[in-house]
């Protein structure tokens, strides 16, 4: 698995009713739920890493600030960029932006760390 500093990926999602805080139980408003935003940011980190038949990455740490609400129907772009590689630990700078009034508005930012693991060895820990 080859991952390099500065490598990045962006995933684009549209907020659905099922993505709201009300729907996922993280609040009582029909706006993008923080757990969904976190999942989308993690998806961007996974897009950077990819995987092989023998290796993949798993999330180990998340520190994200959810800065602004987003309505159902909003288009959200989530970007992850490799900021640090320390042995098998890969740290990403992440951010989420929403197109609003012809501007890209920052709605979330933070840091996510993933560990490179051997698939079989990791899954053996379930036994």
How would you label these PLM feature ranges?
Residues 10-16, 65, 111-113:
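Generic structural detector for well-ordered beta-strands
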Residues 7-9, 58-62, 74-78, 88-90, ...:
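A generic structural signal for short beta-strands and their flanking turns/coil linkers
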